[in-house]
Every structure is written in structure tokens, then in C-alpha cells.
A protein has these predicted regions:
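Short conserved beta-strand segments at catalytic cores or DNA/RNA-binding microdomains
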Residues: 3-6, 64-80, 98
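Mobile genetic element proteins and their domesticated derivatives, centered on retroelements
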Residues: 12, 28, 57, 73, ...
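Active-site beta-loop-alpha junctions of metal-dependent nucleic acid enzymes
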Residues: 30, 34, 83-106
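Two-metal-ion RNase H-like nuclease active-site motif
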Residues: 50-63
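C-terminal domain-tail junction helix/linker
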Residues: 159-161, 170-214
Length: 214
């Protein structure tokens, strides 16, 4: 529940109590930290090949009063490819994200779409010089796919009352995005019935990954 829905630890505690399971919210937190990474690894092993357009964006996150940046890449379906918490919003930070992406994806994309931040262009020229790069400067909405990918995390922030450290945030998004990716339809523009079927299949896969009895 905590990994899938924007629920606080205390709300999960109350929902479990309603089902006859008596645990504290602190126990729920420990469960998420202990089992979440294993669930994410199982889900990633079944991840299909992603598509060939990368949308990149960065969003500011305040941790213990200090400004940090969460750099994220998604494909054209909105599937999160990778994300990394960094203290800088510069070329070095952009290069780190691109290198992580190349290592994890195994090959460069056909096209890379970003906002107008100059660090992306500088990093692209050094790390992926043959990849087509488009900036949405003057092309309103071109990078909305990446910008919209921040919304699920933004909805979680008030519930979690902030993140206690960069390491905690990195661990959280690693698991949170792996779970969320499972429920993202593979192609845009699906019918309602196809989307419903996708969700049923995703829930079945989630139960297998989490070792939940049917």
C-alpha cells in the first residue's frame, strides 16, 4: 500500500488495523525499507525493452533545509528510465545522468528531449554526440512528458512530510518508480478496456513480485 499509493505510514497502519493486522507505522516503514528494494529488483527483471526517445528534466527537492535536484529521464510512454539525486544543476550533473542511462539502457536513444537548461546540450555533446537533441525552448509542451513524471512524487511529498536525507530520497524513488512503472501502460492512447486489462495484469505481476497470495 505504502509503495503503490500516496498514503502516509499512519494511514497504512490504520488500514491494516481495519483488516485485523495490528502493526505500528514504524513497522510499516521498516518493511518498506527492508523489502522494497527486493520488490523493485524483481520488477526490473521483467521490464520490457523501452522505447527510443528520452525525455529529461530536473526538479528541485528541499531536504533538511537544503536545495537538491532530482534528475529524471522517462521514455515516450512516461516510463521512468532512471533518476538521480544531486546537489548541482550543472553540466557535470547532466553528464552523470546521461552516463547512468547509457550504462543501464545499453544503447543511446534516437532522440533526447529536454528543457532549455544549457547543461543538457553541453552534456549531450560530450556523452552522446550523435544523438539528436531537441529543447522545448520556443516549442511549448515538448518536454511535458518529463515534467509530468514529477507529479507522482510531488503528491507524495506532503504525505511523507519531506525526505530526511539525499540517500533516503534516492532509495525511495528507486523503489517507488519501479512499482509505478509497472502500472504505466506501454503505449499512449489505449482504450479504456485495454487500460483496465493492463492494470489487472500489472496487479498480478505485483503480487508475484511481493509474494502476495492471490
Amino acid at each position: 500500500l505504502y509503495l503503490r499509493f500516496p498514503l502516509s505510514l499512519r494511514l497504512v497502519e490504520e488500514m491494516l488495523l481495519e483488516r485485523g493486522v495490528v502493526v505500528s507505522y514504524e513497522t510499516v516503514r521498516r518493511w518498506a525499507l527492508k523489502f522494497g528494494p527486493a520488490y523493485a529488483r524483481r520488477l526490473r527483471r521483467k521490464t520490457p525493452s523501452r522505447r527510443d526517445i528520452w525525455h529529461l528534466d530536473e526538479v528541485v527537492v528541499t531536504i533538511a533545509g537544503q536545495k537538491h535536484w532530482l534528475w529524471r529521464a522517462v521514455d515516450q510512454d512516461g516510463y521512468v528510465l532512471d533518476e538521480v539525486v544531486q546537489t548541482r544543476r550543472n553540466t557535470a550533473a547532466a553528464k552523470r545522468l546521461l552516463r547512468r542511462l547509457l550504462r543501464k539502457q545499453g544503447c543511446p536513444p534516437r532522440r533526447m528531449i529536454t528543457d532549455k537548461l544549457g547543461s543538457y546540450a553541453a552534456a549531450q555533446r560530450q556523452v552522446m554526440p550523435t544523438v539528436e537533441h531537441r529543447s522545448h525552448k520556443g516549442l511549448k509542451g515538448l518536454s511535458n512528458r518529463a515534467e509530468n513524471s514529477h507529479l507522482p512524487l510531488r503528491r507524495r511529498e506532503p504525505v511523507t512530510q519531506g525526505f530526511r536525507s539525499p540517500r533516503y530520497l534516492q532509495r525511495f524513488v528507486s523503489v517507488f518508480s519501479a512499482v509505478r512503472n509497472l502500472f504505466v501502460p506501454s503505449h499512449s492512447g489505449r482504450s479504456a478496456s485495454a487500460t483496465h486489462l493492463h492494470r489487472l495484469n500489472a496487479m498480478a505481476e505485483w503480487k508475484v513480485a511481493a509474494n502476495v497470495a492471490a
